[in-house]
Amino acid sequence: MRKIGKSHKLDNVCYDIRGPVLAEAMRMERQGYDIIKLNIGNPAPFGFNAPDEVREDLIANLAKAQGYSESKGVFAARKAIMHETQRLGIKGVTVDDIILGNGVSELIVMAMQALLDSGDEVLIPMPDYPLWTAAVNLAGGRAVHYLCDEE
């Protein structure tokens, strides 16, 4: 049987959400250290809960939440975003211009795949969220990091 190896597209991808940093944190936990993992953007375990109103609306609408939404996302949510762009004075944004996803990670990857050609350079602040660099590399672009210096 032929061994299936990883794609060379992953050669320049380092994504510590699931990589060596997480492995070290897990090793330290096994040794008894109390580790707060902020690497996956899940604030709930640290006491940052959704507002009661949001949770109540989710519960009230759960029975109707069967199946898929529209491919661009829930219309009411897209419309609310459009109204917010208008409130902010951003002109020309229609509800059809707005695409929702399952989270920022999915949307960053989709945007990079859609916008980058091989070799395109993307400026990324450093330190960065590893997904930004990974998404650029996977899309064939080249991440160009610049240092964020508060001075």
Predicted regions and their residues:
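Long, low-complexity, intrinsically disordered polar/charged segments
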Residues: 1-8, 116-122
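N-terminal small-domain helix-loop-helix segment of the aminotransferase-like
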Residues: 2-5, 11-103, 110
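Short, hydrophobic alpha-helical packing/hinge segments within bilobed ligand-binding/sensory domains
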Residues: 107-108, 132
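PLP-dependent aminotransferase-like
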Residues: 113-151
